[in-house]
């Protein structure tokens, strides 16, 4: 047993990845000027993951999203031909938002200001009192398109008028590793949202390492991700994948809820290594869990994986399915956080009970994390400390900062990806 656990933590990943081992400045968490550079150099040039295409399964389905970091409101819709398209949700007349609902189905979109009407392919088809306009041509006044691509069911957009690289080039080795994953229950998300008084990276950091779990989450999931053999929750695996990164977290295979915790003991899933991250025994999970990218070490002591899709999304895998974390910056010190948990429909009362237990525990853990990052942001803003000191199991945070530094300084996206 000790020989197996001795190999849990990747050794020298920081050095092998060519990363510095020195302190990391906190300036990017608190500087309005650095945030302005991130807006232009990162978020306006990178491919941004918005969600799953299952959110708009039918022709005419649409969703709208605020992308505050780019001062944009985006309309994503599915055409009659089944293609996913994206547009700036801005009327060609005088700039009003055309669609005010967060989601729905429509063959046409009518701006509420003056009833200018657009088909869901973006073309302008109706203008009241059109003859009173001067030298007017509807063909030149459609909704402004946004580059959009779907990869493995994930919808990405690029807000640059002409993206400098394709989505496939942007994803790089991440796309190779994650290709072909059969995502279970991708059309059934449970959504958790919160506006947080913290820089987006401060929140993201909390999900890029497991070092804090035995301490911060001692009363919730601490003993799920740590054990006497692995008291500091060392990782099973860590990989730097171009601009992106993977962490695979240890799970205590001998975890059992305390006798006093009768609710969790009642719902405990004895078929998984980490009961609080497992919520179903759906057969669809079998092929998902067998995929090489899910639990890549195929360890029996596994809790979850976290794939960080640069810059702002984590896709997490666990024994019971998958979930995402989105970190949308709203200012240099505020973030709109969104989590989506994809769980299969419960086949039994016991499975439904475990799902409810999973969500309630997830909310508990999120509250611990989000309260802590707000305190962390205040600490950084005090400027009492100018640097962070990161250890080996925080390598993903270091890699994120290295990647951001390249993007902020690079004159082209291809240079940033090199």
Regions from the PLM with identified roles:
Residues 1-15, 360:
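General detector of N-terminal leader/presequence modules that precede the first folded domain
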Residues 9-25, 184:
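Short, contiguous pre-domain boundary segments
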Residues 26-70, 74-75:
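Non-catalytic accessory segments flanking enzyme active sites
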Residues 43-47, 96, 212:
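Generic structural signal for secondary-structure transition and capping sites
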Residues 45-51, 57-58, 127-131, 307-311:
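Short Pro/Gly-enriched beta-strand edge/turn motifs at strand-loop
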Residues 51-58, 136-138, 302-306, 340:
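Short linear motifs in intrinsically disordered
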Residues 55-177:
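Rieske [2Fe-2S] iron-sulfur-binding domain
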Residues 83, 89, 149, 154-418:
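C-terminal catalytic domain of Rieske-type non-heme iron oxygenases
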């Amino acid at each position: 047993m000790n020989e197996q656990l001795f190999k849990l933590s990747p050794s020298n990943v920081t050095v092998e990845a060519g990363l510095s081992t020195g302190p990391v400045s906190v300036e990017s968490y608190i500087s309005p000027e650095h945030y302005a550079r991130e807006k232009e150099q990162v978020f306006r040039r990178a491919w941004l993951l918005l969600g799953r295409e299952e959110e708009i399964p039918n022709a005419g389905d649409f969703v709208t999203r605020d992308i505050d970091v780019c001062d944009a409101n985006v309309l994503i819709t599915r055409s009659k031909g089944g293609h996913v398209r994206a547009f700036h949700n801005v009327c060609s007349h005088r700039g009003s938002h055309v669609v005010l609902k967060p989601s729905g189905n429509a063959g046409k979109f009518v701006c509420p200001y003056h009833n200018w009407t657009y088909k869901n392919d973006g073309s302008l088809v109706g203008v009241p009192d059109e003859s009173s306009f001067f030298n007017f041509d509807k063909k030149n006044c459609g909704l402004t398109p946004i580059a959009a691509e779907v990869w493995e069911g994930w919808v990405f957009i690029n807000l640059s008028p002409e993206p400098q690289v394709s989505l496939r080039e942007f994803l790089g080795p991440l796309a190779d590793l994650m290709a072909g994953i059969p995502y279970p229950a991708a059309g059934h998300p449970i959504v958790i949202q919160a506006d947080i008084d913290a820089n987006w990276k401060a929140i993201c950091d909390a999900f890029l390492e497991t070092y804090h779990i035995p301490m911060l989450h001692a009363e919730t999931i601490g003993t799920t991700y740590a054990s006497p053999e692995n008291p500091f929750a060392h990782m099973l695996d860590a990989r730097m994948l171009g601009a992106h990164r993977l962490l695979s977290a240890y799970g205590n295979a001998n975890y059992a809820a305390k006798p006093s915790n009768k609710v969790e003991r009642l719902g405990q899933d004895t078929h998984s290594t980490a009961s609080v991250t497992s919520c179903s025994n759906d057969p669809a999970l079998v092929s998902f869990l067998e995929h090489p990218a899910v639990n890549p070490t195929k360890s029996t002591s596994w809790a979850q994986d976290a794939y960080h899709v640069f810059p702002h999304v984590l896709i997490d895998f666990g024994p019971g399915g998958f979930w995402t974390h989105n970190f949308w910056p709203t200012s240099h010190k505020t973030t709109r956080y969104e989590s989506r948990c994809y769980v299969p429909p419960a086949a039994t009362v016991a499975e439904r009970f475990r799902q409810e237990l999973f969500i309630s525990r997830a909310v508990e853990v999120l509250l611990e994390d989000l309260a802590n990052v707000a305190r962390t942001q205040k600490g950084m803003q005090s400027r009492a400390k100018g640097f962070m000191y990161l250890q080996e199991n925080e390598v993903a945070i270091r890699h994120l900062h290295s990647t951001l530094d390249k993007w902020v300084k690079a004159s082209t996206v291809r240079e940033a990806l090199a």
